[in-house]
Amino acid sequence: MPGWSCLVTGAGGFLGQRIIQLLVQEEDLEEIRVLDKVFRPETRKEFFNLETSIKVTVLEGDILDTQYLRRACQGISVVIHTAAIIDVTGVIPRQTILDVNLKGTQNLLEACIQASVPAFIFSSSVDVAGPNSYKEIVLNGHEEECHESTWSDPYPYSKKMAEKAVLAANGSMLKNGGTLQTCALRPMCIYGERSPLISNIIIMALKHKGILRSFGKFNTANPVYVGNVAWAHILAARGLRDPKKSPNIQGEFYYISDDTPHQSFDDISYTLSKEWGFCLDSSWSLPVPLLYWLAFLLETVSFLLSPIYRYIPPFNRHLVTLSGSTFTFSYKKAQRDLGYEPLVSWEEAKQKTSEWIGTLVEQHRETLDTKSQ
């Protein structure tokens, strides 16, 4: 295959950075354009220090700026779109999430058509499939089953509609007369070094004598390591550029999991951090059905107050459902079409993440010492 170029949106994020680390090892890749609204100074420095002969171009711009996106896409062979706002708590305004996650994706698709970019890979989420009820049980689900989120909450809704737009755009005619090929990857809940979620959990625990706050002791999920999700994106990029593989991939979506054991959100947090003295909150928890109806009451209060005051409930029905359901998926379709096999084993992923948590503990030891006095 001839030399090619790749644009990665959300490149300064948790997943985006890992994709870049793998992309620089790709043969025949001539240029990587890394795009984000703002890059942290340390992230920008890491990009400049990458040991590679591949040209790395750092671009700061807004995904809602259509003209900027069109310029960023000029001469690009593959777009990997990871940029998104992830919020299931209701802290970020609904319209902001819809603008970035849905409108931004639509803008990028149009930029690809105008700039004649032939391949588009969308980082979707398992949230587009559900769960829709804490009573729902999906074990090792797969793509042939019909699972679609019915939540109107901005994150799952925006990701679902963005994925639909991406898959519907497959086969669109490009400005140069070519054809746009698209696919979507639906990773499970992602863990690993530099995870913002894990970082927040650990820092919060350090402020509470090492007790991990409960985020879901009743659910069953299959978390996926960030390095394996990044690897799936690399394989999708290869696949869409391969004339033999592409017909089976374009217009398709894939669940991305790995060999991490099925467990609750609380269990994964504890397993990854117990080496550093963290423990689970042993206090009594309300049953999920009661939490669900309490969440409904809090959401009702929020709605009634909305004309005069923006009240953000401490939890909502969507969050309760996520933390109380059984919802796991197989990666067999990705294995079949993309040639996906987890690059990193569970044991290695656990070790790497635990070691990183150790560095967090070291950085915040002063906080821990102060609390324990």
UniProtKB/Swiss-Prot annotation:
<keyword id="KW-1133">Transmembrane helix</keyword>
<comment type="function">
    <text>3-beta-HSD is a bifunctional enzyme, that catalyzes the oxidative conversion of Delta(5)-ene-3-beta-hydroxy steroid, and the oxidative conversion of ketosteroids. The 3-beta-HSD enzymatic system plays a crucial role in the biosynthesis of all classes of hormonal steroids.</text>
</comment>
<comment type="pathway">
    <text>Lipid metabolism; steroid biosynthesis.</text>
</comment>
<dbReference type="Pfam" id="PF01073">
    <property type="entry name" value="3Beta_HSD"/>
</dbReference>
<dbReference type="GO" id="GO:0005789">
    <property type="term" value="C:endoplasmic reticulum membrane"/>
</dbReference>
<dbReference type="GO" id="GO:0004769">
    <property type="term" value="F:steroid Delta-isomerase activity"/>
</dbReference>
<keyword id="KW-0560">Oxidoreductase</keyword>
<dbReference type="InterPro" id="IPR036291">
    <property type="entry name" value="NAD(P)-bd_dom_sf"/>
</dbReference>
<dbReference type="GO" id="GO:0006694">
    <property type="term" value="P:steroid biosynthetic process"/>
</dbReference>
<comment type="similarity">
    <text>Belongs to the 3-beta-HSD family.</text>
</comment>
<feature type="active site" description="Proton acceptor">
    <location>
        <position position="155"/>
    </location>
</feature>
<keyword id="KW-0443">Lipid metabolism</keyword>
<keyword id="KW-0812">Transmembrane</keyword>
<dbReference type="GO" id="GO:0005783">
    <property type="term" value="C:endoplasmic reticulum"/>
</dbReference>
<dbReference type="GO" id="GO:0006702">
    <property type="term" value="P:androgen biosynthetic process"/>
</dbReference>
<dbReference type="InterPro" id="IPR002225">
    <property type="entry name" value="3Beta_OHSteriod_DH/Estase"/>
</dbReference>
<dbReference type="GO" id="GO:0003854">
    <property type="term" value="F:3-beta-hydroxy-Delta5-steroid dehydrogenase (NAD+) activity"/>
</dbReference>
<keyword id="KW-0496">Mitochondrion</keyword>
<keyword id="KW-0520">NAD</keyword>
<keyword id="KW-0511">Multifunctional enzyme</keyword>
<protein>
    <recommendedName>
        <fullName>3 beta-hydroxysteroid dehydrogenase/Delta 5--&gt;4-isomerase type 2</fullName>
        <ecNumber>1.1.1.145</ecNumber>
        <ecNumber>5.3.3.1</ecNumber>
    </recommendedName>
</protein>
<feature type="transmembrane region" description="Helical">
    <location>
        <begin position="288"/>
        <end position="308"/>
    </location>
</feature>
<keyword id="KW-0256">Endoplasmic reticulum</keyword>
<dbReference type="GO" id="GO:0031966">
    <property type="term" value="C:mitochondrial membrane"/>
</dbReference>
<keyword id="KW-0413">Isomerase</keyword>
<keyword id="KW-0472">Membrane</keyword>
<feature type="binding site">
    <location>
        <position position="159"/>
    </location>
    <ligand>
        <name>NAD(+)</name>
    </ligand>
</feature>
<dbReference type="InterPro" id="IPR050177">
    <property type="entry name" value="Lipid_A_modif_metabolic_enz"/>
</dbReference>
<keyword id="KW-0755">Steroidogenesis</keyword>
